[in-house]
Amino acid sequence: MVQVEKGHVAVVFLNDPERRNPLSPEMALSLLQALDDLEADPGVRAVVLTGRGKAFSAGADLAFLERVTELGAEENYRHSLSLMRLFHRVYTYPKPTVAAVNGPAVAGGAGLALACDLVVMDEEARLGYTEVKIGFVAALVSVILVRAVGEKAAKDLLLTGRLVEAREAKALGLVNRIAPPGKALEEAKALAEEVAKNAPTSLRLTKELLLALPGMGLEDGFRLAALANAWVRETGDLKEGIRAFFEKRPPRF
């Protein structure tokens, strides 16, 4: 269900283009396995997520939707947990992640893009959290959406279920950069390469801080930051970075 191009920057393709790359249970499991494999590979410094074909991800699997109301509570909960694990895994992934939104990103597909650290969106693409339009609720997405855009903007997006174009998505803070038509993957890879040049330890620690700080008070946040500042000074990456600075050469992390 996914294809992986390995390298310094790995690219993970949602690979079900005929069905617009839905987040089926099989797709979620394939993505989780791919992310596990890439985390274990020390040669991979960053990961790009994108979709094959004309869509990033259309969200729910239509075949699954047709029978979802007939499933029992246990099976529905099991499916919800698989999506929860996927969103949590991407959102807390130790290596930098960049979503290349090459086409429509709808419902869970839009949530998957948002879970990445950075998002590059094709200027002709649209995204939205459309669950309420068919009686669903964007429950898992809401956890990270409200952190990304704030309560009022999250309510606007989730209660209307409207689709937004790239320019508005950037203004809201849903995406970081807008790419010319057909260039989302190219620009996402370039952005990932830029990030991947930096110290891996610093990148991982920065991500951990940004995850922890929103749930902390001011004093606790500063204390955690001070600990991180002290800890990083003992790492090999910092020693190499300082050495390279004084030797006037690029660091070799």
From Swiss-Prot:
- InterPro entries under this entry? ClpP/crotonase-like_dom_sf, Enoyl-CoA_hyd/isom_CS, Enoyl-CoA_hydra/iso, Enoyl-CoA_hydra_C, Enoyl-CoA_Hydratase/Isomerase
Q: Subunit comment for this entry?
A: Homohexamer; dimer of trimers.
GO terms for biological process, alphabetical = fatty acid metabolic process
EC numbers on record: 4.2.1.17
Entry-linked Pfam families? ECH_1
Q: What does the record give under GO molecular function? A: lyase activity
Main enzyme class:
lyase
Answer yes or no on keyword Lyase: yes
Family, according to the entry, reads as follows: Belongs to the enoyl-CoA hydratase/isomerase family.
Among PANTHER family, the record links this protein to: ENOYL-COA HYDRATASE, POLYKETIDE BIOSYNTHESIS ENOYL-COA HYDRATASE PKSH-RELATED
Name the residues annotated as catalytic in the UniProt entry: E131
- What protein name does the entry list? Putative enoyl-CoA hydratase
